[in-house]
Structure formats: C-alpha cells, structure tokens
C-alpha cells in the first residue's frame, strides 16, 4: 500500500516523516513542519509587540504631571481609542 505524502495540512505537530534508507528499510522520525515553526515564531513576535505597546502606553500615562481630572480622562480616552484601532488593524 502506498503512503500518502505528508503535508502540514494532513499532519499535526506530531508530523512523521518517513524516509527510505539505502537498503530499502523505512525509518520514522518525529519532525515539526517548517510552516508550523514559522507560525509559532510569528505568534511569539506578535505577542511581544502587543505587550511592548501596552507598556509604552501605560508609561506615558503614568508620566503625566498633575493633570486635571477632565484633561486626564480626555487624553486617556483618545489614547485608548487609538490603541484599540491599531489592534484591530493588526
């Protein structure tokens, strides 16, 4: 019986790559497809970028020097709306 060709779409992270040796024996070794590695890498970077944006936002918010309550509320709401829009775009 012929083996199906392994692709990231037919196999999960428990991907098995079957190779033929010179003497005709088959060996199986677990392997992560490159596409899954790349996706994990991208997700890690995106979460770091999002976290960095939040930290910068709160540092700016904390650095305001004795603003009035009204101006503080307006400024925070503007920043929050801008931040939320960027999250939707990305």
From Swiss-Prot:
<feature type="compositionally biased region" description="Polar residues">
    <location>
        <begin position="1"/>
        <end position="27"/>
    </location>
</feature>
<comment type="function">
    <text>Plays an important role in promoting lung pathology in both primary viral infection and secondary bacterial infection. Promotes alteration of mitochondrial morphology, dissipation of mitochondrial membrane potential, and cell death. Alternatively, inhibits the production of interferon in the infected cell at the level of host mitochondrial antiviral signaling MAVS. Its level of expression differs greatly depending on which cell type is infected, in a manner that is independent of the levels of expression of other viral proteins. Monocytic cells are more affected than epithelial cells.</text>
</comment>
<keyword id="KW-1045">Host mitochondrion</keyword>
<keyword id="KW-0945">Host-virus interaction</keyword>
<protein>
    <recommendedName>
        <fullName>Protein PB1-F2</fullName>
    </recommendedName>
</protein>
<keyword id="KW-1035">Host cytoplasm</keyword>
<dbReference type="Pfam" id="PF11986">
    <property type="entry name" value="PB1-F2"/>
</dbReference>
<feature type="site" description="High pathogenicity">
    <location>
        <position position="66"/>
    </location>
</feature>
<keyword id="KW-0899">Viral immunoevasion</keyword>
<feature type="region of interest" description="Disordered">
    <location>
        <begin position="1"/>
        <end position="34"/>
    </location>
</feature>
<dbReference type="GO" id="GO:0039545">
    <property type="term" value="P:symbiont-mediated suppression of host cytoplasmic pattern recognition receptor signaling pathway via inhibition of MAVS activity"/>
</dbReference>
<comment type="similarity">
    <text>Belongs to the influenza viruses PB1-F2 family.</text>
</comment>
<keyword id="KW-1048">Host nucleus</keyword>
<keyword id="KW-1119">Modulation of host cell apoptosis by virus</keyword>
<keyword id="KW-1113">Inhibition of host RLR pathway by virus</keyword>
<feature type="region of interest" description="Mitochondrial targeting sequence">
    <location>
        <begin position="65"/>
        <end position="87"/>
    </location>
</feature>
<dbReference type="GO" id="GO:0052150">
    <property type="term" value="P:symbiont-mediated perturbation of host apoptosis"/>
</dbReference>
<dbReference type="GO" id="GO:0044192">
    <property type="term" value="C:host cell mitochondrial inner membrane"/>
</dbReference>
<comment type="subunit">
    <text>Oligomer. Interacts with human SLC25A6/ANT3 and VDAC1. Interacts with host MAVS.</text>
</comment>
<dbReference type="GO" id="GO:0016020">
    <property type="term" value="C:membrane"/>
</dbReference>
<keyword id="KW-1090">Inhibition of host innate immune response by virus</keyword>
<dbReference type="InterPro" id="IPR021045">
    <property type="entry name" value="Flu_proapoptotic_PB1-F2"/>
</dbReference>
<keyword id="KW-0053">Apoptosis</keyword>
<keyword id="KW-1043">Host membrane</keyword>
<dbReference type="GO" id="GO:0042025">
    <property type="term" value="C:host cell nucleus"/>
</dbReference>
<keyword id="KW-1097">Inhibition of host MAVS by virus</keyword>
<keyword id="KW-1046">Host mitochondrion inner membrane</keyword>
<keyword id="KW-0472">Membrane</keyword>
<dbReference type="GO" id="GO:0044164">
    <property type="term" value="C:host cell cytosol"/>
</dbReference>
